[in-house]
From Swiss-Prot:
Gene3D superfamilies for this protein: Velvet domain (2.60.40.3960)
Gene name per UniProt: umv3
Organism: Mycosarcoma maydis
Compositional bias per record (Basic and acidic residues), positions renumbered to this chain: 171-181
GO cellular component: nucleus
Sequence segments annotated as region (Disordered): 1-197
GO terms of biological process kind: sporulation resulting in formation of a cellular spore; trehalose biosynthetic process
UniProt-recorded name of the protein: Sexual development regulator umv3
Amino acid sequence: MSAQDDIDTGASNQPRSVVETDQQRAAVVGPRPPRHGEAECTDAIPARDSYQRYDTEVVDVPSMRPPVLPPSRANTLSKQQPRGDLSQSSASSHLPGLRQFTRLAPANMQGKDRSGLLSDRPSGLLLSDHTPNSQHAHRSAPQRDDNGRQSAASNRLSDTNSSAPSPGSTENERVRMHDQRTAPSAPPPLLSDLPRHSTDNKTYRLIIRQQPKQGRLCGLGSKDKRPLDPLPILQLRIIRPDGTEDEDAENSSNLVLQVSLCKEDPITGGYTDAVLVETNDPSYPWTRMLEGRIVASANLARDLDGSRACFFVFTDLSIRQEGQFRLAFKLLALSPPGQVPASAGGHVLTEALTEPFTIYSPRRFPGMTESTDLAKCLARQGIQVPVRNDIRKKQEHLDSLTASTDDMNGLE
């Protein structure tokens, strides 16, 4: 018996299903690649037309799925497959070739010779044969098309790498921020461009438009305030040498009006400054007699007749002692910052003194009166003036109680 007869006899002794399956596999995907240590059999290599038939007829390109083997053949291949040889696994042996991926490539790459694409890739090199170093090199290398331009993915990768801050740039940012924090601050501006008030050959007049008439004694605490009634309102007029009124100077920001309290001296009949009053607290035996904001700034508004005027309003003045008092007002001109030292203060332009008014105890206070038309006019223009529309007098309240009592007695 010859060697060829032995080969035929050995092939005929194999199970029929295995032989038919091998023939089907050879017809579809070609012969099995040689294992390690086996000699390559050139007689089993199919012709060129077999690859063409594999590319065009058998493989389902849209699905890209390997053909399903019968369970008996799959078990046989798993037993014959040695462990650790990933290149001979059933999944990798049925992967479509590189020719099928060229069909999904862009149009400018489909015209390229397939044989040239296959020649660039070594025979038998599968996806599992890539080492981590080769994969990293493949990802880092910029991909280019036929015209030599980089792909969009490689451009995004390069932009991401270039946008990452380097240690040197971070250090420069820290130095710059440190310089900004430790840089000397700019000197305060010398406000020389502000409109300065000039007193050359001008006449200043303070007109008391609203005289306080009465008030209620307030407590020693800072929250117990009883404002004067009515509120003190003064008007400023500045007259030029030619007799015209200087409205721009009246609205100057360096003009302020200061108020102080004066009390009648029963011995001399005059008035002296009333500054302090004795308290019951040993820690603070003295306190200020006049409570509230004692300095007011100018407010340019419309008068009752519609003309422009400059007003000073004191809204929260209260007094901590009973008696007869007067309010003394002084108009001060403050110099702009940087012109004179702060300790120099300002100089007095004109003064005004109110009529005497009375501060009552809580039992004797007759009650608050209704706000004047001037106070309502200023409040409508945005100036903070408290307005009272009702008359709350203690005497009227007592009269109403007496009248109601008489009516009840008459009904009886």
